[in-house]
Amino acid sequence: MSQLRLYDTARREIVPFEPGEVVTMYTCGITPYDATHLGHAAAYVGYDVLQRRLRDRGHETRCVRNVTDVDDSILGRAREIGVHYLDLAAAETAKFDDDMNALGMLPSWSEPRATSAIADIRGFIGMVLD
């Protein structure tokens, strides 16, 4: 079987990819304030293809894709249309999931929400400020 080679951004070159049995991947997810677009699909199709290739080679994959469910764009859009920001984020995330399912994309292993990490984020900011 031919060796998989990937671009290493730290080294700025294509290098042989020599994963263990389990391959972990992270991709920045959506900020769900409006409809999914082709740019979202293009990014996630690339990760989906890589994940499928790794699985075909016998690796277990764990792809984590976050959802930034609170930020200025969500707050502004929610105010603009008169809904609570969490309701907007939930509705747009559900539409995104439907779109990804329609494309036949593999589901993420985990999809942490930014709102679930606010206490940790505040703690990190406090450490930086101290």
Where is each model-derived feature located?
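N-terminal Rossmann-like or analogous alpha/beta NTP/dinucleotide-binding catalytic cores
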Residues: 1-130
